[in-house]
Amino acid sequence: KKNKYGFYEIRFESIGGLGANVTGKILGEAGVLGEGFNGSSFSSYGSEKKGTPVKTFIRFCGPDHPVYINSPVEEPHLLAIFHERLIAYGDVMLGINHGATVVVNSKKSPEELRPMLKMPAGTIGVIDALKIAIEEKTRINMVMLGAIVRALGFINLDVVKKIAGETFGAKYAHLMEYNIRGLDRGFKEI
């Protein structure tokens, strides 16, 4: 799927401290370096502290198509909501069309979330990222990344693992086993 400009667009809605920014960077690099797409990834956040809203934007297109837009993603093909409470804010669901996929970190079922999201059509994927992160001693963002990769369907999980290893390996090599388990469970359990 592409929009009228030739891009597949993704938006993450999160809270500072949950790792959406680094998740977007890993996903963007996996698409560009691992899968051969052209792409971009950037985040928008206020005061760079835990608890404040964070939005991450990712665009992919074919290798022969330049990425010439740096504006926020307004009509994502995939929306990932890193904290269920963000649903209460009206702008989280802005631009979601009937064919969109929404991935939510929640204990609720897709049927329970659909009216909350005011989403009459489209695909809702749910992952209890907090529970899995606690069980696997990792962060929510790694579990969400696995779920997002599964929902996308066009980025290889092994490529994401490789990029995550390169991102965290030098500084946090002792945590990579936990991060990989979180990625795997996010991918399998959405």
Where are these regions (language model features)?
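Active-site cofactor/cluster-binding pocket
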Residues: K1-I190
